């Protein structure tokens, strides 16, 4: 069949539909589990290969893939959690943590490539409807999205940020200290969260590490972009001051990964920040790199793509 002879770009464009489609299907049929099963590694490594080829940025095959992943996430968000803690990975370091009583959002953003949004505004609106509160770790555009924060505020839901994010906005709760903050936060639905805020950093930038415990006594830690050589000295023993996390959400390129993980001693570790598409390809962190690091880790770890979820039992 000579359909593509002499038309290499059209050929690769068609191939991209096939690749993204098959990756989507493989991830759907093989949902996240602890460890590194071959089929998931193959799917995620192939996703790396596609996402590190910038010719596919903002193309129809890429957009279809993202939309498909997000639609699956939205369908699953319609199913209440009866028991345990379910963690959803949205995009980049954006996560949703859900128990029977509460749905918590961390660092949810639309994301963008050259100014074009990745996750649609319509999808974000539906996510916000499901969530009770938004925590933002630090003042970078791939973690803090004004549109997302405004949707929470309009819905009368709390938005928690460090003091250097939108500092003049009185509708937002600004929380940051050099000491550990210990706070109870009341939600619109009448539920309460116990929250500890640790004074982390990404280099010199303040990076709040949130330790959030629900009424079911399920604890989630979101470390944001924690990366600081001095902080690790106190983080290595932080489990003495915090409840044991059911899920530790850790960025895949953090400083001294194993020391940070052992410092919290979590039941499950879930990585974030792979393939942040606003970056050049050298900092679109690869899933193959994440697996390389996590295979050294003694704790239960789970590596997820966009629009996936895992029930921590």
Indicate where each model-derived feature is located.
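Short, polar loop motifs at secondary-structure junctions
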Residues: 91-93, 161-168, 253-256
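Pre-active-site segment of Zn-dependent metallo-hydrolases
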Residues: 1-33, 64-83, 90, 94-135, ...
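Active-site-proximal loop/helix segments of hydrolase catalytic cores
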Residues: 147, 198-265
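Active-site neighborhood of phospho(di)ester-bond hydrolases with catalytic His/Asp-centered motifs
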Residues: 105-109, 130-144, 160-164, 221-226, ...
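Active-site HxH/HxHxD metal-binding segment of metal-dependent hydrolases
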Residues: 121-181
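C-terminal regulatory/interaction regions
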Residues: 1-50, 285-313
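Binuclear metal-ion centers of metallo-dependent hydrolases, dominated by the metallo-beta-lactamase
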Residues: 1, 171-194, 201-204, 214, ...
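Beta-strand-turn-beta hairpins that frame and shape the catalytic cleft
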Residues: 80-86, 98-104, 183-196, 213-220, ...
């Amino acid at each position: 069949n000579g359909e593509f002879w002499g038309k290499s770009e059209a050929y690769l464009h068609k191939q991209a539909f096939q690749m993204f489609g098959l990756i989507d299907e493989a991830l759907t049929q093989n949902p996240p589990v602890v460890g590194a099963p071959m089929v998931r590694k193959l799917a995620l490594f192939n996703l790396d290969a596609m996402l590190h080829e910038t010719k596919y940025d903002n193309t129809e095959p890429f957009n279809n893939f993202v939309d498909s992943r997000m639609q699956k996430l939205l369908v699953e968000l319609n199913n209440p959690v009866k028991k345990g803690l379910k963690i959803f990975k949205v995009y980049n370091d954006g996560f949703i943590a859900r128990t029977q009583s509460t749905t918590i959002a961390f660092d949810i953003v639309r994301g963008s490539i050259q100014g074009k949004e990745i996750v649609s505004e319509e999808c974000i609106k539906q996510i916000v409807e499901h969530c009770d509160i938004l925590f933002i770790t630090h003042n970078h555009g791939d973690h803090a999205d004004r549109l997302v924060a405004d949707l929470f505020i309009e819905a009368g839901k709390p938005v928690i940020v460090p003091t250097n994010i939108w500092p003049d906005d009185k509708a937002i709760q600004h929380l940051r200290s050099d000491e550990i903050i210990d706070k109870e936060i009341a939600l619109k639905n009448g539920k309460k969260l116990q929250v500890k805020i640790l004074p982390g950093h990404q280099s010199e930038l303040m990076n709040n590490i949130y330790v959030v415990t629900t009424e079911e006594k399920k604890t989630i830690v979101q470390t944001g972009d924690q990366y600081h050589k001095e902080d690790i000295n106190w983080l290595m023993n932080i489990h003495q001051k915090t409840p044991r996390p059911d899920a530790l959400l850790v960025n895949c390129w953090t400083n001294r990964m194993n020391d940070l993980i052992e410092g919290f001693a979590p039941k499950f570790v879930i990585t974030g920040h792979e393939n942040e598409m606003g970056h050049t390809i050298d900092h679109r962190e690869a899933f193959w790199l994440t697996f390389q690091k996590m295979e050294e880790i003694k704790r239960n770890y789970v590596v997820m793509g966009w629009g996936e979820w895992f029930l921590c039992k």
